[in-house]
Amino acid sequence: MAISKEKKDELIKEYARHDGDTGSPEVQIALLTSDINNLNDHLKANKQDHHSYVGLLKKIGHRRNLLRYLKNKDIQRYRELINKLGLRR
């Protein structure tokens, strides 16, 4: 269920603000969004997997906090990221 190293490196390269950037809010949100989408697909096939559901809720909460931080810090970067990821905000 975790994303592959290649997919993770691709996401980091796409959303990084500079070379070697792995900790910016944009990168973290993009990685969490990928994990959330994978977990959603898993839960559609495995409705009884409550442990994964709890993990999904934790990831959603973490992403929500990072999005709030980015929105308060730099609204322009927030809007660009929302559009790029296709989130409904």
Curated annotation (Swiss-Prot):
Q: Look up the record and give one Gene Ontology term from the biological process aspect.
A: translation
Family recorded in the similarity comment: Belongs to the universal ribosomal protein uS15 family.
Task: Report what the protein is called.
Answer: Small ribosomal subunit protein uS15
Subunit structure, per the record?
Part of the 30S ribosomal subunit. Forms a bridge to the 50S subunit in the 70S ribosome, contacting the 23S rRNA.
Q: What does this protein do?
A: One of the primary rRNA binding proteins, it binds directly to 16S rRNA where it helps nucleate assembly of the platform of the 30S subunit by binding and bridging several RNA helices of the 16S rRNA. Forms an intersubunit bridge (bridge B4) with the 23S rRNA of the 50S subunit in the ribosome.
Spell out the Gene3D superfamilies in the cross-references. 6.10.250.3130, S15/NS1, RNA-binding (1.10.287.10)
Q: Report which superkingdom the organism of origin falls in.
A: Bacteria
Q: Entry's SMART domains? A: Ribosomal_S15
Entry GO terms, CC? cytosolic small ribosomal subunit
Keywords on record: Ribonucleoprotein, Ribosomal protein, RNA-binding, rRNA-binding
Gene Ontology molecular function: rRNA binding; structural constituent of ribosome
InterPro entries found in the cross-reference section: Ribosomal_uS15, Ribosomal_uS15_bac-type, uS15_NS1_RNA-bd_sf
